[in-house]
Each structure stands twice: as C-alpha cells, then as structure tokens.
Amino acid sequence: MAKALHITIFLFLISSNLLAFINSARLLDEIQPQPQLVPTGQIPTVAPTEAEEEDGTDDNPGLATTTTTASAVTVPAGPAEATEPLLEFFMHDVLGGSHPSARVVTGIVAQTEVNGIPFSKASNSIFPVDNGVPLVNSNNINSVINPNTAPLLTGLGGAQTSTVIQNTNGNSNDALSANSLPFVTAGNLPPGAALQHLMFGTITVVDDELTESHELGSAVIGRAQGFYLASSLDGTSQTLSLTVLLHGEHDQHDTLDDAISFFGVHRTASHASQIAVIGGTGKFEHAKGYAIVETLHNQDNQHITDGQDTILHFSVYLTYKA
C-alpha cells in the first residue's frame, strides 16, 4: 500500500513538471524579442544587408534621378519662346556721296588693257626707275583709279542693276576725295567680266548710324562699327562682323555704354537673314541669341543724301542677358 502511494506521487510530480515545461515554451514563443540595450556612449555597428539595399533600389528606381535633375538643371527660355524682339533699330549704310559711312578697303576693279594698272605693264609715271617702288600721287592717281577702275561697291543691298557711275562731280577726280569715292556698276566693267566675280572677296568697313525708324533723319540711338565681306561668287551673300554701340541713358549721346556684337551671313537676295549674337558689354554682358536682318527697299527719305543709302532693319532676340 505504501509503495503504491509513492509511485502515484512520483508520477504526479513528473506530470506536473512536464506540463510546466510545455507551458513555459509556449509563452516564450508568444513574447516578442526586446531591443538590445546599448550602454551610454557606445554606437553599435550595423552592417546593411544586401536584401535591404536591393529592396530600396527596386521600390523606386527613378525617383532620386528625377529629383536631382530637376534641381540641378535650369533651362533658359529658348528663341522659339521669344515672341517680341528685345531691341529693334535701323542701320543706314551709305556708300559714295559726300558723307559716306562705308568704304571699300579691298577689291579694285581694273581694266589693265586701258588704264595701265601697276604691275601690269611698264609706266613711267608709276615706275620712275627700274625695280622702283610705285609712287601714287595727285598727278598720276587717275591713271590708277578712275570710273572704270574704281572700288566696286555693291553694298549690303546687293549688286547694282543700273549702268550709271554714281559720283558727285561726274568725273574721275572724285577718286582724289576721301569723302566722295565713286563706285562702278555692271555696265562699266571690262568686257567678259562678271560683276559678281569681281565683287567676290571685297571687304567694306562701316561706321553706320543707328536710328529708331527707317528715316535717315530720325533719332540716332548709336552706331554700328565693323566690316562686311562679299563671301559668295554669285554676289548674294555678305559675311557681317559688327559691334553695335548704343548710347547711354538720359539722352547721353556722347557716351556709348552698351554694346552687342554680331556675326553671320546676310543674304541680300532673301527678305530676311539671321545672324548670331556672339557677346556684349554693359547691360548686354554675356548676351546670347540672334538677330533677324531685313533689307528695306524704296523707303521714303531713303535717298536724301548724294550717296547710296541701304537700310537694314535689325530685330534682336536675346535668350540670356545679365
């Protein structure tokens, strides 16, 4: 009897311990793990896992790139967005007459068979001695430059269509005057010579007035200084290199503060041409853009001078102005 009681008590204790062990294991599974406490002043080193990096990249692949591009790149307004020109003016290119603003520096049209141009054949008035230096003075200049050998000036308006030699006094003595250079047209060229081929390579320097309107006597806002080059064999293109000097504010016409420089090809046979803005000074420093150049024909008051006045209308579009 006593032995059976001991066995029963032993089995009861084993069963109780087993149940307690099973219950404690279930409770441990249900309790969430607590974060590890780090002593003050120590920073734990945590190595990122590859899975986290891949997840961060795959979730939003283009977000970081789009944000960086939008904040770093600033696109200025392009020429297509500019509906109105920032600046407009009219340039008067006056050739010949008593007050020319343009002068040819290269491109003499020579008829050597008639006029005896230097280096074509011997001339005692040009070469006083053998192997001498040619001396051009008021006594023999008309043997070198006369209406048939004058500088060929067709200007920015294109080649002349008439056959009249335009000068002031109607004779070749105009070549002696710096302010009244004559110019020749197609009817006065040597036989077999084409006007366009003789014009090719001619350089003309200019110091032209800029006005607010097309009339030559309108308000002057500045000057255009530079040169243009006959750059096509057919005579329809002029390569322009100009710096436009604008008057200062408050009607200070004796002060030229701001300037814009242009370079490009003006096609005289076209209604309008585009040339590039290559820089500037003053309020136009770092200027970029372009200008539309139009040749105006048969305007009122266009021929109030005794020279040939070619009017160019400039419309300037700037995409950046400091």
Curated annotation (Swiss-Prot):
- Signal peptide region: 1-20
* Cellular component GO terms, alphabetical: apoplast
Q: Which GO terms describe its biological process?
A: phenylpropanoid biosynthetic process
What top-level branch of life does the organism fall under? Eukaryota
The places in or outside the cell where this protein is found are:
Secreted, Extracellular space, Apoplast
Q: Which UniProt keywords apply?
A: Apoplast, Secreted, Signal
The UniProt entry, under PANTHER family, shows: DIRIGENT PROTEIN 24-RELATED, DIRIGENT PROTEIN 9
Its family remark reads: Belongs to the plant dirigent protein family.
Q: What is the protein's known function?
A: Dirigent proteins impart stereoselectivity on the phenoxy radical-coupling reaction, yielding optically active lignans from two molecules of coniferyl alcohol in the biosynthesis of lignans, flavonolignans, and alkaloids and thus plays a central role in plant secondary metabolism.
Q: How does it assemble?
A: Homodimer.
Designated name of the protein: Dirigent protein 9
Report the source organism: Arabidopsis thaliana (Mouse-ear cress)
